[in-house]
Amino acid sequence: VLNKQILATGYNGAPVGMRHCGEVGCIRQQQGVPSGERHELCRGLHAEQNVIIQAALHGAKLAGATVYCTHHPCVVCAKMLINAGVARVVFRGDYPDELARQMLSEAGVEISVFPKK
């Protein structure tokens, strides 16, 4: 979001044209990989990754924008948001990734928790 305009949207899911984990099974569950570890062992992309891709595909610049997401970004998404120039991240649920917090803070990305009703 920039200047009260939605620039792009993203969601957690498999790449375009590929079957979702619900259809083929979750490799992370099958291998007992805990949440927050071994991000490369997943068919899906995080919503933050998809929003950056969608913005790029449609020519929208995210520099200075605010990204709203369900949980605090993981470190992979945090690095991508930093490089995309995102100025602020607003999330509802926490995610235990201290390195992501540190990197966003060091990069000057504002972090806000969306208030619960």
Regions found by a protein language model. Give the residues of each.
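Zinc-dependent deaminase catalytic domain
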Residues: 1-117
